[in-house]
């Protein structure tokens, strides 16, 4: 039993794993904060002795701060997001994107998938003598197009199926 088995690890120097370098160390990215400006040369600080030998404070000189040019200027842009408008089978009030006026939409009914499906269903039921065309006369079975009354632009469509 003195021979080590294949499942035993060979004894040797153990190496402790170290933490990987940080992102800044790896990529060489500086911090996002600008470096402070270099100090301006000014008067020496300390006490100045007067003629009577007593210490007095030096006169204070104020220098105006020098603006640091920012190479990474941030431009602010305001974005207006308009919610999508849901069209239904009745007129809606909205601002027309073409003429930019507040309008109430005009409706136009067109044969759509539900109209043709209803016609085919009536035809299969035996309404061949013209009764199968009734869905083309019923607005509740047709698709609805919304138009601007001012510029006549198509604003949207409500599809029933």
Curated annotation (Swiss-Prot):
One of its GO terms (cellular component) is cytoplasmic side of late endosome membrane. It is a peripheral membrane protein. The keyword DNA-binding applies. Keywords: Cell membrane, Cytoplasm, DNA-binding, Endosome, Golgi apparatus, Lysosome, Membrane, Metal-binding, Nucleus, Transcription, Transcription regulation, Zinc. GO terms for biological process: cellular response to lipopolysaccharide; negative regulation of non-canonical NF-kappaB signal transduction; positive regulation of canonical NF-kappaB signal transduction; positive regulation of transcription by RNA polymerase II; regulation of cytokine production; regulation of macrophage cytokine production; response to lipopolysaccharide. It is found in: Cytoplasm; Nucleus; Lysosome membrane; Early endosome membrane. Phosphorylated on tyrosine residues in response to EGF. It holds the Pfam family zf-LITAF-like. Its main location: cytoplasm. Monomer. Interacts with NEDD4. Interacts (via PSAP motif) with TSG101, a component of the ESCRT-I complex (endosomal sorting complex required for transport I). Interacts with WWOX. Interacts with STAM, a component of the ESCRT-0 complex; the interaction is direct. Identified in a complex with STAM and HGS; within this complex, interacts directly with STAM, but not with HGS. Interacts with STAT6. Belongs to the CDIP1/LITAF family. Plays a role in endosomal protein trafficking and in targeting proteins for lysosomal degradation. Plays a role in targeting endocytosed EGFR and ERGG3 for lysosomal degradation, and thereby helps down-regulate downstream signaling cascades. Helps recruit the ESCRT complex components TSG101, HGS and STAM to cytoplasmic membranes. Probably plays a role in regulating protein degradation via its interaction with NEDD4. May also contribute to the regulation of gene expression in the nucleus. This is Lipopolysaccharide-induced tumor necrosis factor-alpha factor homolog. The gene is Litaf.
